[in-house]
Amino acid sequence: MIVLLCVIFAFLVYSNWHSWLESLDRNPIRAYALTHKTRFTTNADIRETLSQKPALKGYFGQDIQDVKAKLLAISWVRDVVVRKVYPDRLSITLIEHNPVAVWNDVNFLSEQGIVFSLPPDRIDKTGFPMLYGPDTEGKVVLEAWSKIKADLKARNLDLSSVSVDNRGSWTITLSNNVELRLGRGEWTPKIDRFVTIFPEIDVPEGKKLAYVDLRYEHGAAVGFSPLPK
């Protein structure tokens, strides 16, 4: 009998507690506050994201991980910290990707080599390195950019873009728009070869040097294009 009474008492306590929580949780979370100023994310972005289904629940019923997953779906958001504030608010900390290069003309690369997108009106692409390749190779291309740029700087040359194709063949473009086709494998000896032969290249009148193909074991092939009129 005592055991039965204890069970009944526990059930009543649980039921009343659950009903009390439900009464407190009738109103959904309706407001948020950012803990710091963001570079790219607007209030409209957050409102639109939080309004997506499933709808927000009340303070006790809302799963923080669900809110975090919604916000992480924003392409330029790298990480999120979300905290519930009673009775109906969220405290949100957004960590955004920092763009360090333009990727395939339309997207950006972060410092970690992660590909992400930004609305065109949020950032000016001018001055960013231009990098190209499969999205899975973002980190590799970014590291190559840093190494090749330093290598060229030691030779008084400046780098404009780096590209790798699906076969792992590399092409770089100098700031004077000359394209160096490096192919696969180690690029340092190929750049050395270019530096050696560059002064000896005889550019025809009315033409400019367009590319130097360094994929050969010895020597190189060169191509020219008309000077702009």
Swiss-Prot record:
Record membrane topology: Single-pass type II membrane protein
Topology Periplasmic: residue spans: 22-229
Keyword list, A-Z: Cell cycle, Cell division, Cell inner membrane, Cell membrane, Membrane, Transmembrane, Transmembrane helix
Transmembrane segments: 1-21
Signal peptide: none
Location of the protein in the cell: Cell inner membrane
Cellular-component GO terms for this entry: cell division site; plasma membrane
Domain POTRA residues, every copy: 27-97
GO biological process, one term: FtsZ-dependent cytokinesis
Pfam families for this protein: FtsQ_DivIB_C, POTRA_1
InterPro entries from the UniProt entry: Cell_div_FtsQ/DivIB_C, FtsQ, FtsQ_C_sf, POTRA, POTRA_FtsQ_type
Predominant localisation class: membrane
PROSITE patterns in UniProt: POTRA
Oligomer status and interactors: Part of a complex composed of FtsB, FtsL and FtsQ.
Free-text function comment from the UniProt entry: Essential cell division protein. May link together the upstream cell division proteins, which are predominantly cytoplasmic, with the downstream cell division proteins, which are predominantly periplasmic. May control correct divisome assembly.
Membership in a protein family: Belongs to the FtsQ/DivIB family. FtsQ subfamily.
HAMAP family on file: FtsQ_subfam
UniProt protein name: Cell division protein FtsQ
Organism name: Actinobacillus pleuropneumoniae serotype 3 (strain JL03)
Gene: ftsQ
